[in-house]
């Protein structure tokens, strides 16, 4: 198969490969095909207190390693729940602590046709609220 416009990507997850930007680079090198690219979901690289509290560093490293091969992105938010066990929870856009403006700045440097997708919201009203939040933050272009 030699796709001309389509790319096969994997969504990173905290609990499966690729679970880090470095693992994604390794997979890209191992597969070594032009048709294999990156789906960016930086929130899914947040898996422990360190990556949670160093999000800008994580974004810098992630886009440095994977930006040139990124073909699509997820946009979402997260919080670290209080308690003795680490629990990073996905929350609606604007209700968490993700560096959304910085993340969008990084995404804006990608190809202008790169799609940015919201996901895991419970209903259309939640998607509308997320878009409204982006507009109020002057982050919608």
Residue positions per predicted region:
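Hydrophobic, aromatic-enriched interface-forming segments
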Residues: 4-24
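Histidine-acidic metal/acid-base catalytic patches
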Residues: 18-141
């Amino acid at each position: 198969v030699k796709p001309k416009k389509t790319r096969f990507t994997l969504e990173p997850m905290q609990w499966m490969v690729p679970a880090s930007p470095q693992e994604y680079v390794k997979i890209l090198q191992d597969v070594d095909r032009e048709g294999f690219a990156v789906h960016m979901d930086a929130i899914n690289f947040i898996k422990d207190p360190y990556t949670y509290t160093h999000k800008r560093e994580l974004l810098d490293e992630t886009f440095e390693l994977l930006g040139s091969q990124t073909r699509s992105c997820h946009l979402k938010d997260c919080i670290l729940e209080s308690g003795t066990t680490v629990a990073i929870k996905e929350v609606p856009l604007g209700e968490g602590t993700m560096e959304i403006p910085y993340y969008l700045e990084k995404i804006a440097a990608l190809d202008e046709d790169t799609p940015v997708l919201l996901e895991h919201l419970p209903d259309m009203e939640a998607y509308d609220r997320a878009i409204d939040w982006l507009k109020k933050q002057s982050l919608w272009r």
